[in-house]
Design a protein with these regions (language model features):
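Alpha-helical transmembrane segments of multi-pass membrane proteins
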Residues: 1-244, 256-258, 267-271, 294-303, ...
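Alpha-helix N-cap and loop-to-helix initiation/capping positions
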Residues: 280, 382-383
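Surface-exposed interaction patches
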Residues: 315-316
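Soluble small-group transferase modules, centered on the S-adenosyl donor enzyme superfamily
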Residues: 211-285, 292-295, 431-529
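Short beta-strand "acidic-cap" motif of Rossmann-like dinucleotide-binding folds
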Residues: 327
Length: 529
């Protein structure tokens, strides 16, 4: 009788452990999904919505399936077979996932005309994650069936199972974000949690003396893959990348050409920073932004919110000697890359942290540049009237704010229109300059009525051999005053992800229509030639 009691207690303890590690794996896979998709589709709130919605659908289906399966057959063997299958599928994601994403995106590109990123991320998420999360969704209802011995204590048992699953989910939320992804990357994070599921299954099958060899082989192979020296590349079609890495916040890619060093945080679109190896101007928006120090009454203190790799900071030191530059960058790995590959001068004070939080505690500046981006959009908290009011309050008399807007669109109610109207509601004197040959728009704002006249006079006074002579007249001729309007962003209401996605959708739709036209004329094989 005593032995039987110990056996029941041991069995129940193992079921509780299953609830804990399964809950942990659910959240780890969800966070891994966001990191797997982010380099291709961004990590915006829209993509997160797709991921969470897909996973909730899968879990709901799994809950129904698991409950019915447990009622039909109360033997836990089927549950642990499902967990073993989940382990195999999860372990395959790092190797097959990028090709599935490319395949789904390529297929949808042939006929999806609008909201391509939404549909492509949704299709990829369904293809990769519905099945394993549906299997994990069967765990809780199955365990409730197996662990409940009588109606007298079923409430307590269910509560304990739910609590352990939730505690596991909490750990599975923090562990990938702060430990495994920064330490070993997304690919090995999937393998770590696949190995956990495989070991749990193996433990069960050892006690039952069933499926021992198969589960042992699977557990050993997955564990071996964790330590195997394989090279995982999100941009698998790219050769010769200088750096491909991940941080808590970003996918990071550094590549070099004969003339420049380039940082990207997305494999599909956008370049975050460019450094010209020969020094000098880049021909990009950083050059246009140099009009801000010329416009300011003084240029002694410069603050950059969104330092990136420090191209603008380096240019400020080069073309405006004597100024002190502070840059705030939330991603410490980008700061490290800026020192190692982009030649960020030691004179630049690089602060790791959130731009708005730093601004609140900082002093006064002559120039403040706002160039903070989360993938394709400005973070909502750095696009509102409250934020720009705070910037204004940290500018010295005669100071200038310059904002880089990376998505140019002429459509009514576009992202840039919202930003222009919002800034114009805070600063009385604003103007924009379109960057030639790119999609960027630079906005200059000041409370000094003499600011733009000062810029004109200083451009006229530039020496003929001054490097800025080649770019500043171009900026001057491109300046257009901002009148302002009723599209205002606030801390409470700032739909920047939707606005940014709308502009990106316009760009992608144009590119895809060109692609479809090529296929109609020359056939699909023309893309491979």
């Amino acid at each position: 009788m005593e032995a039987k009691g110990k056996n029941v207690a041991g069995r129940k303890l193992f079921l509780y452990a299953t609830a804990f590690f399964s809950g942990m794996s659910v959240m780890a896979i969800e966070l891994g999904a966001s990191r797997l998709l982010a380099p291709y589709f961004s990590s915006s709130q829209i993509v997160w919505t797709v991921i969470i919605g897909t996973i909730m659908i899968a879990m709901a289906i799994g809950n129904v399936w698991g409950g019915r399966a447990a009622d039909k057959d109360p033997d836990p063997v089927r549950l642990y077979r499902r967990l073993l299958l989940t382990a195999v599928w999860t372990a395959a994601i790092p190797f097959a996932g990028r090709y599935v994403i490319a395949g789904v995106s390529g297929l949808l590109a042939l006929f999806v005309k609008h909201n391509f990123l939404v549909w492509a991320s949704l299709g990829s998420c369904f293809a990769l994650f519905v099945f394993p999360l549906m299997l994990l969704g069967t765990v809780t209802p199955s365990l409730m069936k197996y662990a409940t011995e009588s109606l007298d204590d079923n409430g307590r048992t269910v509560g304990e199972l739910e609590a352990l699953g939730t505690i596991g989910s909490i750990i599975g939320t923090f562990l990938p974000t702060f430990v495994t992804i920064p330490a070993v990357g997304t690919a090995r994070t999937f393998l770590i949690f696949a190995a956990i599921l495989a070991v749990i299954s193996l433990g069960f099958f050892v006690t039952r003396k069933k499926w021992v060899a198969r589960s042992a082989v699977i557990a050993v192979v997955i564990t071996a893959l964790m330590f195997a020296p394989f090279n995982y590349s999100f941009a698998f079609w790219e050769d010769g990348l200088t750096v491909e890495d991940e941080s808590i916040y970003n996918y990071l890619q550094v590549r070099e050409t004969d003339e420049s060093v380039i940082l990207s945080t997305n494999v599909a679109f956008g370049v975050q920073s460019v450094m010209m190896k020969g020094g000098g101007l880049t021909g990009m928006y950083y050059d246009y932004a140099l009009a801000a120090p010329l416009m300011a009454e003084n240029c002694e203190d410069v603050l950059i919110l969104g330092l990136g790799t420090g191209t603008f900071a380096s240019q400020c030191l080069k073309y405006f000697p004597g100024c002190e530059v502070t840059g705030v960058e939330i991603d410490e790995k980008i700061v490290a890359l800026s020192r190692e590959y982009f030649g960020l001068p030691e004179e630049v004070e690089a602060v790791v942290g959130d731009g708005r939080a730093y601004l609140t505690e900082s002093g006064m500046y002559d120039v403040i540049m706002v160039d903070a981006y989360q993938d394709i959009t400005i973070p909502f908290q750095m696009s509102s009237t409250e934020f720009f009011t705070e910037v204004r309050e940290h500018l010295n008399p005669g100071g200038v704010m310059v904002v880089n807007m990376s998505m140019r669109s002429e459509a009514e109610g576009s992202m840039n229109e919202y930003l222009k109207d919002t800034i114009a509601s805070v600063f009385p004197y604003c103007a924009t300059a379109k960057v030639s040959g790119g999609s960027n728009l630079e906005l200059f704002a000041t409370t000094d009525e003499e600011g733009f006249a000062r810029l004109d006079s200083r451009i006229a006074a530039l020496a003929s051999d001054d490097p800025l002579t080649g770019i500043m007249p171009r900026v001057q001729s491109a300046l257009e005053p901002v009148e302002g309007g009723g599209h205002i962003l606030t801390d409470d209401k700032a739909p920047v992800e939707l606005l940014g996605m709308r502009v990106l959708d316009e760009i992608i739709s144009t590119e895809l229509e060109s692609l479809r036209g090529q296929i109609r004329e020359n056939g699909i094989m023309s893309l491979l030639g």
